Amino acid sequence: MTGPSPVDRARTGSKHHLLTDSSGIPLAISLTGGHRNDVTQLLPLVDGVGPVRGKAGRPRQRADRVLADRGYDHDKYRRELWKRGVKPVIARRSTEHGSGLGRERWVVERTFAHLHNLRRLRTRYERDDSLHLAFMLLGCAVVCQRRLMAP
């Protein structure tokens, strides 16, 4: 996986993109090359989630809001989220650290930590993307099972 720029080719490996609910249950996951921009995966992740069950009544078709770090900051994608009825809560690249977004984003970071506690996902050994994605999906199933079975 190499990018169009010689600078992009230096970034090896892959990136995991994850969308969770407020309790840390993985809802959607994707895999990209290490040289790809994070923001390209924002809309496919949001679109990959079906109806969200919650309180009694009709299930919501989408999440109310999306929290993301600075890698997903782009005005075009913010507008697209608003069009879909999702409030973007994304840190701006120009703001300093300590904006308070981390108080809510820790749930996603904790889910990444649970995934990377599985030795097979911590270091990528597979050359084939589909095989690595399969292990990521299996890891998400393990995280869901552990989360749902917790007292």
Predicted feature descriptions by range:
Residues 79, 83-85, 98-151:
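Basic, amphipathic alpha-helical segments enriched in Lys/Arg and hydrophobic/aromatic residues
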Residues 1-93, 100, 139, 146:
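Polybasic low-complexity intrinsically disordered regions
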